[in-house]
């Protein structure tokens, strides 16, 4: 930071003038809670991902946890370190009063885009992607958090689809009792666990269900249930057993198929209790296709 910007930052209470510090290189991608930019850090010349959170929507979300000392999205993201989790460089407040997060820029497709396009790049890479996603989610849980929005949209792949990284901790909360009370229904409806939809107490096993739905779609190019844009379709999650994954992907390794279906058990007690159990269950699987 230059000396002029340093003193200006002090006068602004440590807030950052985004326009002065970052050059926007690519138009914003608007999300539900934020805008995302490809930017150049004028101080370091580094190309970064710049996420600016919508002030009103962020305040409304955080109001649900008023008095609980919930860490911000930036604080959570910065505390996580894993090869399959996006790197967060810095975070703070803009001079306009908006939270911002600076992270590595991932110049690859979202997993959701590859699924929508039924990309051939996924062939032969699915098992590796499943393991990386599972390890990333395990790292989030081991750090003491629940992600609460595991879905293909929140995994960004490399251009060759051999690796991926977990992103977006906007709905993530500490895995503590006060943050897991019924009534806090958040996430992407198509991937919601039954206990979330039905407003029951939740824990990290809701992520395991959403992970299972995402992996199912990775192989089937279909969800285990009817797709819907709101919570009404999600009410059907867990009411009947998902079709066997082999109906859509006949070559799937049976051990992997059973592990995915166990993630999708309606009752949390019948799922894997942590991601380590899932990884252990598939440790001997060598290829996504049965030999």
Describe the residue ranges of each PLM region.
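Conserved short submotifs of the Hanks-type protein kinase catalytic core
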Residues: 96-110
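AlphaC helix of the eukaryotic protein kinase fold
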Residues: 57-79
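Protein kinase catalytic-loop region centered on the HRD/HxD motif
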Residues: 135-145
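A short, aromatic-enriched beta-strand patch in the conserved N-lobe beta-sheet
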Residues: 90-92
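Activation segment signature within eukaryotic-like protein kinase domains
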Residues: 129-130
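AlphaC helix of the protein kinase catalytic domain
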Residues: 111-121
